[in-house]
Amino acid sequence: MLSLSLGRAHGGFCDGISRRNMLRLGGTGAMAGLSLPMLLELEAKAASGRGAQAKSVIMIFLEGGPSHIDMWDLKPDAPKEIRGSFDPISTNVPGTQIGNILPKCATITDKFTILRSHSHRDNGHQTGRHWCLTGHKPSFGDGQANSTPFNELYPSIGSMVSRELGHTGDVPPYICVPEPMGPGGPGFFGAKYAPFVIETDPVQPDFQVRDLNLAAGTSRRRFDLRRRLLSGVEQLAEVRTGRGRAASMSTYYEKALELVTSPGARRAFDMNSENPKLRARYGLTSLGQCCLLSRRLVEAGCRFVGISHGSWDTHV
């Protein structure tokens, strides 16, 4: 049987070749143009175990969804009832066009990848967001604002990254700015993998993260005494109410305590220490400053930053 897939067995990716696939190709090497040295080279590459190099993710989630036929996939040859309202422009990648409302993106298209093969058939905002952020098609809810909270079931991509890659640096592994990112909760992973939500817009002149510093009049010694007292109360709660709920509350407290006691976290959130020229390059807007803050958080060790920006809602 002829098979020219060089990914991991059956439906894999291009980062390796399994021994089974190599043997399947071996019998048709001449037909496929693969010599024995080429096959050995492919197998050696697969054995090297070279994995993904990315350490962090910044996801800009455009709430409501601006239309793809206005931005990345204009379909200029489609009937006017289908194609977008804007004209296509050429980019610095030959053969690739995008919407004329993105002129700066057109000059750096070689620096990013446009995926035009992703879609789903759900036109409800709530259910569609759940599908995008969790990878699971909702099987309940009516897509309206009063639907059952979907993030109570499946974990979001941010929680998955947090769980699989773990904690590093002085900041939480999963952070949302400036508000929760749709159904971006931990689902059945539990509170340990919930996002830390900034709840403040970094474009504001007086931007600061709530409760990041010790309360006025509270010394470090007094803070440590309170922390030990809290630990004793938690142990009592575990005995009286069971481990599950107490553990969830403990996770929230620990996240807050880590931020309060971490100089690195305070530095990452200190937007006033940033070079004014760099802030201006990002744009003195909510989205621009959220992107700059996200960069600072990633540099401080955050695994996944979710930026929520919207609401977009195109109806014709």
Identify what each model region corresponds to:
Residues 1-316:
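Ligand-binding pockets and gating/stacking loops
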